[in-house]
Amino acid sequence: MEKPLFALDFETTGLNPHMDGVLEVGLVGARDYACVVSDAPPSSPAARAAHGISPQMARRLGKPGRKVLGELLEVLGQEPVRLVTHNASFDRGFLEAWAQREGWSLPQIDWVCTLTGARELCPDPSISKGLGKLATRFGWHTGRLHRAQTDASLALRLHQLLDSWRSIKEQLGEGHPVVYLAGPVRGDGDPRSIRYNQERMFALAQWAQGILPQAAFVVPHGNFAFLDESGERGLEVRERVLEACGVLLERCDALILCGVPSPGMVYEKGVAERRGIPWHEAPGWDLPEWISY
């Protein structure tokens, strides 16, 4: 039986698990939990600047630390679990020190570190592996970073993305494949939406190149801006563009579809299936409210 999967994030009053304390808990996955700790030690200036939780807010919204830990352990349960976190050594140190102070035992935990996973999968040093930086690269709606529930949700999403790209790397890691990279380009052709899609597409291509440095990536979706900004978006033009993409795809060794399929991606998947070109799926980016679907 597969162990339940959770993602955990702590906001803390400092960096030392033996001197500082947990100020906020965020847990998502098989079951969710979130709470502020009302009686945590005072936050260091750096910690306060990051999480923005004032002592007054903690007292007003929080619960005593012993109660919060008890509720967290109740949600985790007594059976073995998998716990995803971005920088596992940090959160693990605080959880173990907290449980030791309260005299409670923890369930068996398989720690999964998305920071380590991202560094191993994509060793390119020019790509930041910070949680916020990766969320921006992938175009995810983040809300308020450095709040526990938000960061836990992002860590879980990153874990799922890393799993997808590990699978792609296993299948395309040999040789020097030419890979067609497709993303959910949408919008009404205005310059703002065009540039947004273009930036997302090339940020994703840089990530893919960091994972598969020996591959050559074809990114036609990133070039649609030059056509769209000219104002020519008639049906005939669109059909000709898709046909050109299909011809290009036929010369590639693989297709990677990123995100919720757009009409163009559905067409490209059909071309790949008809031509026997292997295709793979990976998460894409979130579309902002001002882009029409």
Regions found by a protein language model. Give the residues of each.
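Acidic two-metal-ion nuclease catalytic site recognized across multiple nuclease folds
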Residues: 1-3, 137, 156-176
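Conserved non-catalytic scaffold segment of RNase H-like nuclease domains
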Residues: 1-108, 125-146
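Anionic group-transfer/hydrolysis microenvironments
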Residues: 11-13, 26, 87-88, 115, ...
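Short hydrophobic/aromatic-enriched beta-strand-loop microsegments
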Residues: 105-112, 279-281
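Short alpha-helix plus adjacent loop in nuclease-associated cores
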Residues: 112-129
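Acidic, divalent-metal-coordinating active-site segment for phosphoryl/phosphodiester hydrolysis
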Residues: 147-160, 267-271
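Conserved catalytic or regulatory cores that recognize and/or transform ribose-phosphate-containing ligands
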Residues: 170-293
